[in-house]
Amino acid sequence: MGIMEAERKTTGWAARDPSGILSPYTYTLRETGPEDVNIRIICCGICHTDLHQTKNDLGMSNYPMVPGHEVVGEVVEVGSDVSKFTVGDIVGVGCLVGCCGGCSPCERDLEQYCPKKIWSYNDVYINGQPTQGGFAKATVVHQKFVVKIPEGMAVEQAAPLLCAGVTVYSPLSHFGLKQPGLRGGILGLGGVGHMGVKIAKAMGHHVTVISSSNKKREEALQDLGADDYVIGSDQAKMSELADSLDYVIDTVPVHHALEPYLSLLKLDGKLILMGVINNPLQFLTPLLMLGRKVITGSFIGSMKETEEMLEFCKEKGLSSIIEVVKMDYVNTAFERLEKNDVRYRFVVDVEGSNLDA
């Protein structure tokens, strides 16, 4: 069932140009269709991708752009054919709001690999209307791309799980790396990396954090529970780790050499790339051939994996380490994020902010 035209206007904070500066922006929500869920947004995490998109770092940004793809809110209306949700449910929306439904990935419930997937923002619906993200009062999303937040999970803690959490959970699940006793490495300790440590530890893995400096050692070992911490340039320590890891999750989003991390892998070990890097990466093929090692990639996660991940995090008592901010601080938060000055994820308190300011 639809909603009144007067109620279809909402306000978000949008970037207007590649400066990336956000300010209030009023726009029209799409009508609530038969399978749509209308959501009053409570909070939204800030991902590094939001920074790239608002500044047009990837060369494909469209403005005005309301970012945000780690959205948690309350259902205020459901379409006539919605069966999964009722008014009052606390729900989440991640990176996607649409897919074709008929391709091979969609048929396998891997909609994140659909060639016609629709992003939560900086994209268009099939009718040509722009998609807008979670830095706003409300959003309307097809029920397929909405998940229930487990009862008892704090909304601000749930938000980063919808991107950072599922991004590391998905490859561990898909590549058969969930069983206890494995030895893994997490390269890079940002928003995704810190959840990688937590999730891998909760699966019973021995986890080594690999970083470029010592500044996060204490946090990694004491706050996140990592078993070891290695500086990538420490040749002696890296040599000690050679041929010892079942996998390395590489979250680094800038160009870097792969050989040092390939050398850490056991026979059949996997180097799983997650950082978006536009420059070609190089490696020596014998490093792969002589250990039957694998370089692979993984991209966010499916809706089924997102649901599994949320239940896993609830069961294990996992949460993100976050800093909650108001919307009027968001531009400063973006500046700090660009300098990696956050431990480990900003979450915008949308409900408690004046978006019209």
From Swiss-Prot:
Binding positions for NADP(+) per the UniProt entry: 49, 167, 188-193, 211-216, 251, 275, 298-300
Keyword set includes Chaperone: no
Binding site for Zn(2+) 2: C100, C103, C106, C114
Cofactor(s) it depends on: Zn(2+)
PROSITE patterns recorded: ADH_ZINC
Subunit structure and binding partners: Homodimer.
Superkingdom field: Eukaryota
UniProt-listed GO biological process terms: lignin biosynthetic process
Gene3D superfamilies linked to this entry: Medium-chain alcohol dehydrogenases, catalytic domain, NAD(P)-binding Rossmann-like Domain
Organism per entry: Arabidopsis thaliana (Mouse-ear cress)
Reaction(s) this enzyme catalyzes, per UniProt: (E)-cinnamyl alcohol + NADP(+) = (E)-cinnamaldehyde + NADPH + H(+); (E)-coniferol + NADP(+) = (E)-coniferaldehyde + NADPH + H(+); (E)-sinapyl alcohol + NADP(+) = (E)-sinapaldehyde + NADPH + H(+); (E)-4-coumaroyl alcohol + NADP(+) = (E)-4-coumaraldehyde + NADPH + H(+)
GO molecular function term, any single one: cinnamyl-alcohol dehydrogenase activity
GO CC, alphabetical: cytosol
UniProt function note: Involved in lignin biosynthesis in the floral stem. Catalyzes the final step specific for the production of lignin monomers. Catalyzes the NADPH-dependent reduction of coniferaldehyde, 5-hydroxyconiferaldehyde, sinapaldehyde, 4-coumaraldehyde and caffeyl aldehyde to their respective alcohols.
Pfam families linked to this entry: ADH_N, ADH_zinc_N
Deletion consequences: Reduced lignin content and rigidity of the floral stems.
Tissues where the protein occurs: Expressed at the lateral root initiation sites, in the vascular tissues of the primary lateral root and the root caps. Expressed in the hypocotyl, cotyledon and leaf veins, apical meristem region, at the base of the trichomes, hydathodes and cauline leaves. In stems, expressed in the cells associated with the vascular cambium, interfascicular cambium and the developing xylem. Expressed in the vascular strand of petals and sepals, anthers, stamen filaments, stigma in flowers, and abscission, style and stigmatic regions of siliques.
EC number: 1.1.1.195
Protein name as it appears in the record: Cinnamyl alcohol dehydrogenase 5
